[in-house]
Every structure is written in structure tokens, then in C-alpha cells.
């Protein structure tokens, strides 16, 4: 059974600290929005859908603590809360989607007493979390039809239960295929520099009893050439209107390799990851993270001091390299501009 990385209980938001996995399973408690923002920024929680769920809970915690004498002042304070949460990570559009949904819910309830609005916002955050799990399962059912029995599936980064409200996007498709009776084995790229593949994907799949083999990022091409991979499936942090996909750094390289070797390259993502306001991948903001993630592994330095370092957290895979985009409302192929727009 897949883990849920975010919980709400008795006024407290709890998150598993994904930075410590797989060696330590530590749950942290959050009682205010500033702490939730820090958790998103420092990657206690990560993965676009999970970030959206965490942000919704953060907005609800922030709303709970607002002292206001009018709806207008409450809404202004809620916007400040949401602005703080929105400033944490720029690429994952689910973050902004969830925060806008929370503010829209507040505006919808303008006629109610403020205490009732605050309670409704916590209910809305819980609804976002529950709906994300249901969305992932629907996506899994659609995507499972694309995965053949006995398939050897390569995935990059972690698009599993840990990256969502539960079940997973790319790993949700794999889980659904296994649940349908198919024999599936997974190859997980380690995913430098944050090692989400080795620390998180391998941990999740192993915990669920799904066969998984960990590989270094630079092994993928050789294994494709040797016929050891049948298809690739990844998640997404933002999908532009034309089907270009921003995902964890290294995804583009895997897509190029898949194209060269004639392998299907699938992207699994909910509608909340699709940003029709962004025309193409060139307009997606790409987060640059601290260089220490590249120069260090934990406390151990791996590179000389003073060296120049780049650490973009994401890259963009052009739509032309993508075989299909799997969503909770079905699978889109070919004309992504029309196909993605028709989902809404």
C-alpha cells in the first residue's frame, strides 16, 4: 500500500522528511504557514502534486491564525500568506494552482463569518489532498493500458506516492499495471544531484514489492541499446500548452535516448500540472538550487572548493519527444495543443 507523505490531524500538518529517506522515516509537525513554506523550500516535501497539497494546508494554517475585522482585511492577509508560500519554488505549477484555489474558495464564501471561512479553507485543503489521490488512481488506470505485460520500465526522479497526495503519477501507472495482474519490473535512475530515484523511488517500489533495479543516470543509454528497457514513464512539474514538459533535470536526456532507440516515452501528470497560459517550454521558469547539492553528498564534499557549479533543478523535454501524456481524463497523443486544451 502506497504511503501518504502529508497528513492532517488535530490541527497539525505532518510530513515525512523526504531528505532523510531511505535510512530514516521521520515525521515532522507543522503548525503555521511559515514552517510549511520552509518545508517546501528545503524539500522536506517535494514533487509537484505534493507541493500543491502542502501549500493548500499551509494556506489553511495561515488563514486560521489571521486576526481581521473584515472580510477585505482577511482576504488581504490570506494573499500575503499565499504569496509567501508561492515564493518557495517557481517551476511546479501545482503550487500556484492550489494557492489560487484556496483564495478562490475564500472569495466564494465572502458572506460567511470569518471563523466559518477559516474552517471551510481547512476542509478545502483536505479535499485537495483527497482528490489528488483519486486523480492519481484514475491516471493510473488510463496509463496501465499502455504498459505491456512483462514490460521493463525506466523512470527518472520520483513521481510516486511521495511526490503526490498518495499513489503517484508515473509510479501510479506502474502500480495500476501491477494491480491489473501484469508483471512489471522497473529500472530507476538514481537522479543526481538530489538522488530522488535511489532514495525515494527505489524505496517506494521495494516497500510495495514491485521489482526495481537501481541504475546510475549515465547507464540508461547503454541499457536501451542492449534491449533491456521497453518504455520510459516520468512525471512532470509543469506542462506548457504545446505539450513541452518541465521535469526533473535529466529527463530531457532520457527522452532523447528513448527517441534514438525507438522506445515510447510517456509523461503522467494531473490537469493541475498543465499550464495553458504558458505557450511553450521556453517560457517555463526553471529553478536554480543551491550549488552545495552538486558539490556535496550529505556532509561530504565531492568537488574542489571554489569551482563553478550549475544546479538547475529541471529541464524541458520538447513535445516532439513525447509519445503520450497521461492524465486523469485520458491519454493525449500527437496534437498536444488541441488535445490538452480539450481536457478542460
UniProtKB/Swiss-Prot annotation:
UniProt xrefs under Gene3D superfamilies: translation initiation factor eif-2b, domain 1, Translation initiation factor eif-2b, domain 2
Keywords: Amino-acid biosynthesis, Isomerase, Methionine biosynthesis
Active site residues of this protein: 237 (proton donor)
Record-marked site positions (Transition state stabilizer): 157
This protein's pathway: Amino-acid biosynthesis; L-methionine biosynthesis via salvage pathway; L-methionine from S-methyl-5-thio-alpha-D-ribose 1-phosphate: step 1/6
An MF annotation (GO) of this entry: S-methyl-5-thioribose-1-phosphate isomerase activity
Recorded family membership: Belongs to the eIF-2B alpha/beta/delta subunits family. MtnA subfamily.
Record's protein name: Methylthioribose-1-phosphate isomerase
Lineage: Bacteria, Pseudomonadati, Thermodesulfobacteriota, Desulfuromonadia, Desulfuromonadales
Gene (name only): mtnA
